[in-house]
Every structure is written in structure tokens, then in C-alpha cells.
């Protein structure tokens, strides 16, 4: 059995952030599929035994169960000495961007993806428009930051990049965003991450499992 066991599902970009680090760092790990759509993470026993917060990813290591992707990435970088900040200034920038990612970048993009493609009934257009505006605002900030950089902190990939790209490899039919057309600097950085040894698409890296199904495809008119 691998030292690291990741409770995850293929549709979870937050889980992909951790899986991507493990693969690119050459660390042996195994995925543990979660019945997300079936309510496993809401089960009282699962919460008592795996994660009281009722969320994935959860990384099992040496009898511990670590949760929250940003915290896990920080722990992995410090533990293994790769993809982390190299000095105090980078440490501050890492924390700053991880918080921004969780609150604005991934937070809005992942929510829009669910509302766009995975709710049982179509989401009201006004709600979708509001969420799209939040995505566009957050992505514009990162796209501008990356305009003269290869990666978020300079010329090498770090956990900031792994965190930000968590949901960026899902198909446009799910997300409704054509990143290459709308955010070229983000798209270029995303391609650099995909060129790293160990990278795989999320649905290949993690078990598809029982996640929220894609019930609608984004149309050309909804792409940005």
C-alpha cells in the first residue's frame, strides 16, 4: 500500500491540485474513490472517520488525514522540499495567492461550472451571468499577472500554479469558458504545467467515481 492515499473523485479540481503535486513530484500514491453524488461526504460516519468538514480532497499519510487543498499543498511542499517558496518573500506571495485562489479564482470558477453544467435544472440566466462576472474578474487579475511571467512566482512552477490550475483542464463543454481565447496568459501557463513530467488530465489521474454528472453542455454563446 502506498504511503499516500488520496480520497478524491475525477471531477474534483481541488483533489486534482493535490494529485498533480504528487505525480509531478514523483511520489507514490493511490486514489481512494468517493461516492460524492451519493452523499458519502455527508455521511456522519465518513465525517467522523475521514473529514469532519465533509469535503474532498483528504490525504491520508502515516495515520493522519489532511484536508483543504491549499493546506495540503503547503504541507507537501515543506515536507518534500519541492514546488514550495524559496524564501520569506515567496512564502508571503504563496500564502497570498493561495488565499486568492480559494476565495476568488477557483471559488468562482468551480461554482460556475456546477451551475452551468451539473445542476438538475438549468440555472437562472441572471445567476449564471453574475457568476461569470466573478470568474472574469478573478481571471483577468491572474492573466495580467502572468503576462510577463512563465509561472506565478517567476520562472519555476510552485504550489501556487498547481492550486490555480486545479479546474482549468476540464473540457469547455463543462466549464463554459474558452480559456485560450479569453485569457491567453493563463492558457500559456496552463500549457507549461501540462508539459511537466507526471501531468495527466484529471479524469485520467483520478477515478471518475460517482461525482455530480454533467447534464448540460455549455453553448458557444455562453463561452467567454
Model-derived segments and their meaning:
Residues 36-37, 157, 208-209:
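Positions that flank functional sites
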Residues 1-129, 219-221:
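GST-like domain detector, emphasizing the conserved glutathione-binding G-site
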Residues 53, 79, 148-149, 196:
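Structured helix-beta-strand junction loops
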Residues 22, 198-199:
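Short beta-strand edge/turn micro-motifs at domain boundaries
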Residues 89, 97-195:
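GST-like fold's C-terminal all-alpha helical module
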Residues 202:
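Charged phosphate-binding loop/patch that engages nucleotide di/tri-phosphates or the phosphate backbone
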Residues 206-224:
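Acidic/histidine-enriched, glycine/proline-rich intrinsically disordered or flexible terminal extensions
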Amino acid at each position: 500500500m502506498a504511503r499516500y492515499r488520496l480520497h478524491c473523485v475525477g471531477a474534483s479540481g481541488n483533489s486534482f491540485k493535490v494529485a498533480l503535486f504528487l505525480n509531478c513530484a514523483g511520489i507514490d500514491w493511490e486514489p481512494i474513490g468517493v461516492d460524492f453524488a451519493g452523499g458519502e461526504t455527508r455521511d456522519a460516519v465518513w465525517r467522523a472517520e475521514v473529514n469532519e468538514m465533509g469535503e474532498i480532497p483528504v490525504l491520508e499519510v502515516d495515520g493522519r488525514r489532511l484536508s483543504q487543498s491549499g493546506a495540503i499543498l503547503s504541507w507537501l511542499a515543506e515536507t518534500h522540499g519541492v514546488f514550495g517558496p524559496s524564501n520569506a518573500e515567496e512564502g508571503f506571495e504563496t500564502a497570498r495567492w493561495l488565499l486568492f485562489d480559494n476565495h476568488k479564482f477557483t471559488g468562482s470558477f468551480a461554482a460556475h461550472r456546477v451551475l452551468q453544467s451539473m445542476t438538475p435544472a438549468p440555472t437562472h440566466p441572471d445567476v449564471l451571468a453574475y457568476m461569470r462576472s466573478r470568474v472574469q474578474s478573478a481571471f483577468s487579475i491572474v492573466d495580467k499577472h502572468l503576462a510577463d511571467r512563465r509561472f506565478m512566482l517567476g520562472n519555476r512552477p510552485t504550489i501556487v500554479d498547481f492550486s490555480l490550475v486545479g479546474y482549468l483542464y476540464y473540457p469547455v463543454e463543462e466549464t463554459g469558458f474558452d480559456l485560450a481565447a479569453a485569457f491567453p496568459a493563463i492558457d500559456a501557463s496552463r500549457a507549461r504545467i501540462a508539459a511537466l513530467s507526471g501531468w495527466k488530465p484529471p479524469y485520467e489521474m483520478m477515478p471518475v467515481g460517482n461525482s455530480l454528472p454533467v447534464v448540460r453542455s455549455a453553448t458557444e454563446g455562453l463561452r467567454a
